Amino acid sequence: MADVTSMGEITAIAARIGVDLSQIDLDSIHLPPGEDCGIPSDDDDLMEEDPLEFDAGFGNILVVDNLPVVPKEKFEKLEGVVRKIYSQLGVIKEDGLWMPVDPETHKTLGYCFIEYNTPQEAELSKEKTHGYKLDRSHIFAVNMFDDIERFLKVPDEWAPPEIKPYVPGENLQQWLTDEKARDQFVIRAGNDTEVLWNDARQLKPELVYKRSFWTESFVQWSPLGTYLATVHRQGGAIWGGATTSNRLMRYAHPQVKLIDFSLAERYLVTYSSHEPSNPRDSHAVVLNISDVRTGKVMRDFQGSADEFAVGGTGGVTGVSWPVFRWSGGKQDKYFARIGKNVISVYETETFSLIDKKSIKVENVMDFSWSPADPILALFVPECGNQPARVSLVQIPSKEELRQKNLFSVSDCKMYWQSNGDYLAVKVDRYTKTKKSTYTGFELFRIKERDIPIEVLELDNTNDKIPAFGWGPEGSPICCYPSVTTPRPDIRFYSVPVWALTPGLVSKLTTLKGKQANALYWSPGGRFLILTGLKGFNGQLEFFDVDELETMASAEHFMATDVEWDPTGRYVATSVTSVHEMENGFNIWSFNGKLLYRILKDHFFQYLWRPRPPSFLSKEKEEEIAKNLKRYSKKYEAEDQDVSLQLSEQDREKRKKLKEEWEAWINEWKRLHEEEKMERQKLRDGEASDEEEEYEAKEVEVEEIINVTEEIIPFEESQQ
């Protein structure tokens, strides 16, 4: 902006240069549009005023249909109900709620108009209240007023839609058709994310896709392996396809920190927390449940972190994660969350509470779903004179199937078997003196009549058990370590079928003094790894439970994580960047043979790609098991070919190294021959390259470099 010059200054300047302003017709001077030469005009203040805003269109007006038709006496009550619902979602303008009335009957017409301050508030209200159930007979149908014009343009006569040619999408399960039946895994090291094949035959991984800055924190496979999820500041994204490099959908959720899939991959839960403006307040939490395929937000939950911090373990800002736990099965029909004195169970058909109310359970501490059936297991700790209890509740009827009271309980953990046949409840109880605790087990046989409960008797009643694990794939074998000593005992038990052996839980064996602090079952059962991680420096023992024998013992120094591949053929051990050295991973066979080792700086994540359950029937699987020798001939031949190929590659490698060595020797001989005359010259013309016997002599040569004469006075010499 130009400097402002007053009229007095202009007059002074004119007098100094000899110009008489009275002789000049200022009205005849025409300035360019918008130019005032630094002289303020009288109307500048008017020009600087904010322009008036006028409402354009009807984007801030809603039309709410399917309201009750009521007489004049109930008009104010209905208007109050509607105003209460919609004023929570935005600011309604003065006289912004209009409910038309039939002039003859003086009854409402079943719809109303609502005017908000902004179109954004109207859009939000439409999204939140469309389909709102006022009662069983009145479900709101909400539209924008602007949509009426669009509806009027719909032609009266139906015209058949244009049929577009079908374009098949990419097969998202293509990775399962690998001819070598290999499995994939993803790793994160530094800023790079890599998806690789585990090519155990070639004793190395094969790269599928690599990308830098693919995610801002971590990656996560969906439960069936169809999608790979990444996390960004703007929200989450899922990827899939042959190379896992195609982005399939994005989910807007600013500052998302955690994600979780439903078990059947139909829904994605995204979580974010935000710092409160008042330090005394807790973090604000936002949870969105989105449809995986369409990206549509089916329901969102908002509140303080305190509302989502009851029960569970892990998470951020005090929130237990996952907040929502999904029922077992292939339909993702129910999900639930724990609250203060309630369990809230929702159905995904409407994303509302079952029967519009939560299950009230005073002082409830934890719950878990059966992996196979819509059954909830609830744990309620002791409160006053009321004993602790574990209850089984059927959903959606909310009927209590079984209950067991527990006394002197310090802690309780529930462990479902993978196919939902058994529930093990690990109970830590106080001793009579209340100075220590001991562990016991209650086993619920879910599939048996009346759900009988059996107590697992321990050899040493003073044992405290930190870990427990069911054998997978329907195996009834469980084990746990005792930590009464630094080298715990590992014990194995068999849980027989109730109908055949009533009331018997038999111990199979005890492994004495093992250097282990964690157990990892193979997904296929039978095999497990006894691991001594972190403080035990990566001790590994590969154990066959059927034969009750150790197959191999090994070590992965400083190992922090162990993960079986989904088939149970291979296992990965890794050292993450919590240690500064030896970052990377090892791939082992199920029986403890080290196949290959990969070192990666700043390595911090390793995940096998899950596989969906087998589509084969039990009869077909039994048939394959019977004819396994016949089927295995093909794979044995392939293994033999690969072995021969590897041997040939090794021979070629050794041959190449030999040729490189011989080439180096020949080059050395050539240079030696070229320098022969020079060596002979240095040896006073004597050709001595071929001499085998020689005598080394050490010759000393004295050479006077400088002579200095100094005259010393006689008096000094006498002194």
Curated annotation (Swiss-Prot):
WD repeats, residue ranges: 167-207, 511-553, 555-598
Subunit structure: Component of the eukaryotic translation initiation factor 3 (eIF-3) complex.
Key words, A-Z: Cytoplasm, Initiation factor, Protein biosynthesis, Repeat, RNA-binding, WD repeat
The protein's name in its UniProt record: Eukaryotic translation initiation factor 3 subunit B
Alphabetical list of InterPro entries matching this protein: EIF3B, eIF3B_RRM, Nucleotide-bd_a/b_plait_sf, RBD_domain_sf, RRM_dom, TIF_beta_prop-like, WD40/YVTN_repeat-like_dom_sf
Residue span(s) of domain RRM: 60-147
SUPFAM superfamilies with a match to the protein in the record: RNA-binding domain, RBD, Tricorn protease domain 2
Domain of life where this protein originates: Eukaryota
Bias (Basic and acidic residues): 675-686
Region of interest called Disordered, as start-end residue ranges on this chain: 675-698
Organism of this sequence: Nicotiana tabacum (Common tobacco)
Bias-annotated ranges (Acidic residues): 687-698
GO molecular function, one term: RNA binding
GO BP, sorted A to Z: formation of cytoplasmic translation initiation complex; translational initiation
Keyword Protease set for record: no
Biological role: RNA-binding component of the eukaryotic translation initiation factor 3 (eIF-3) complex, which is involved in protein synthesis of a specialized repertoire of mRNAs and, together with other initiation factors, stimulates binding of mRNA and methionyl-tRNAi to the 40S ribosome. The eIF-3 complex specifically targets and initiates translation of a subset of mRNAs involved in cell proliferation.
Any GO CC annotation of this UniProt entry: eukaryotic 48S preinitiation complex
